[in-house]
UniProtKB/Swiss-Prot annotation:
Subunit structure: Heterodimer composed of a glutamine amidotransferase subunit (A) and a GMP-binding subunit (B).
Pfam family, one: GATase
Cellular component, GO annotation: cytosol
Gene from which the chain derives: guaAA
Substrates-to-products reaction catalysed: XMP + L-glutamine + ATP + H2O = GMP + L-glutamate + AMP + diphosphate + 2 H(+)
Gene Ontology molecular functions: ATP binding; GMP synthase activity
Enzyme nomenclature, EC number: 6.3.5.2
Protein name: GMP synthase [glutamine-hydrolyzing] subunit A
Disulfide topology: none
Pathway the protein acts in: Purine metabolism; GMP biosynthesis; GMP from XMP (L-Gln route): step 1/1
Top-level taxon in the UniProt lineage: Archaea
Keywords of the record: ATP-binding, Glutamine amidotransferase, GMP biosynthesis, Ligase, Nucleotide-binding, Purine biosynthesis
Length: 186
């Protein structure tokens, strides 16, 4: 079984796939217009919702989030889509972030297992989740964004605002390996 990456047409979506391949994690990168039924037939062990330019171009992401009963990781726009589906709120950031930032890990969890209390990550966004959805907890923040990472309290649904797939997040591969372990143990 592989991880399916939903391409929301962001500049880094192909890097997610390449990073997973480098880590020997089988994956498929598919457009966000792929139907839920087609994805279900692929029998994925997990879903990654990639970044993208606009909440108006998210294809079938909401249906995927609501109907797939497997681990999901949303990155950047994917994080914002998860928040939206579960009743959170996304707004334009007071300060757009296009830089390496210091991530503060607030709670030990499977996604950041073995990482420690802080991590250098790459931020590339003009919008951010400002209201945490009900039944979610904040896993990490930064001085640029209060909700850098979140997790559903009862489901293996994670959202991260930053980009683990780029070289400016030196330990991003560990985050993907941890997500893969979450998928394998589900």
């Amino acid at each position: 079984m592989s991880i399916v990456i939903i391409n929301n047409f962001g500049q880094y979506n192909h890097r997610i796939s390449r990073t997973l391949k480098y880590l020997n994690i089988e994956n498929s990168l598919i457009p966000n217009t792929t139907s839920f039924e087609e994805i279900e037939q692929m029998n994925p062990k997990g879903i990654i919702l990639g970044g993208g330019p606009s909440i108006e171009r998210i294809g079938n992401c909401k249906e995927i989030i609501l109907n797939m009963d497997i681990p999901i990781l949303g990155i950047c726009l994917g994080h914002q889509i998860i928040a939206d589906v579960f009743g959170g709120e996304t707004k334009s950031a007071e300060i757009e972030s296009y830089a390496q930032i210091e991530l503060n890990i607030l709670k030990e969890n499977g996604l950041f297992k073995g990482i420690g209390d802080s991590l250098k990550v790459w931020a590339s966004h003009k919008d951010e989740v400002v209201t945490l959805p009900e039944n979610f907890e904040i896993l990490a923040n930064s001085d640029k964004c209060d909700i850098e990472a979140m997790k559903h309290e009862d489901k293996n649904i994670y959202g991260i605002q930053f980009h683990p797939e780029v070289q400016h997040t030196p330990r991003g591969g560990e985050i993907f390996e941890n997500f893969n372990k979450i998928c394998e143990n589900y």
